[in-house]
Amino acid sequence: MIQLQSIDYKDWFLNQSRIPDKESAEYKPFFNFHKELCLNGAMMGSVYINPLLYWHLNFWNTEVDVIDERGRISQKYSNPLLRDNEWVITNEIDRAQQEKKGLVILGIRRLAKSVIESSYIAWGATFDENSQNIIAGLNAPDIKLITDKIDKGLNFLPEAWRWQRIEDNWKNQVTLGIKTKGGERIPFSQILIRNLDEGNNEEAIAGTKPRKLIIDEIGKGSFLRGFQAAVPGFTTPYGWGCSPILTGTGGDMKRFMDA
């Protein structure tokens, strides 16, 4: 059993006014500490802060509605806010992972599904070496909404965790890793993009071995055969090695045939 770190809110990464210099002795221990919180979570008093929530609130970025100096509503690219939505969804994802189960998330618009989906995939790709982190959906426009968020969000991570792009094709595959001065490409993780094409491409996820898997907007077509084709890739002697997340929007469920 892992002994969780205890942390006060003032010590969260987002509350730090000074980040150690890259050349300082503090730099590695500082980011190793926050990496541990992103991987294992922490206790804040008697409250458990799950690892995805800590990552999401401290290191991910998205467009947040704000009021500017003239009283107008505008958007700022910054850390997400903590609402009930983020609390409930990330805790359920954490529980699904601990129980080696999948999770279905259905909700209205503005629930933060796309933001959390993008954060979840980036979280896996940033820390899980040799992992395949898969975004699947029923059509290209919905998939692109998520991949655009990941593409931008990865660029705003701390330099300590910001991988280079060895492959950078957001329609098929992005490989994170290191490019050496000698031209060698050393992969760390993959983000795979798969289009189920309203259920017509049932083998889209087959043959992969996902550590993170999202199937987005499941109400917009038949997804079940595509999901079933993916299951052997994350089935192990110890249970599911991946907790697949299936999401849908309440107003877009008319074509949902797999319930």
Model-predicted segments: where are they?
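Short, flexible loop motifs at catalytic/binding sites
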Residues: 1-259
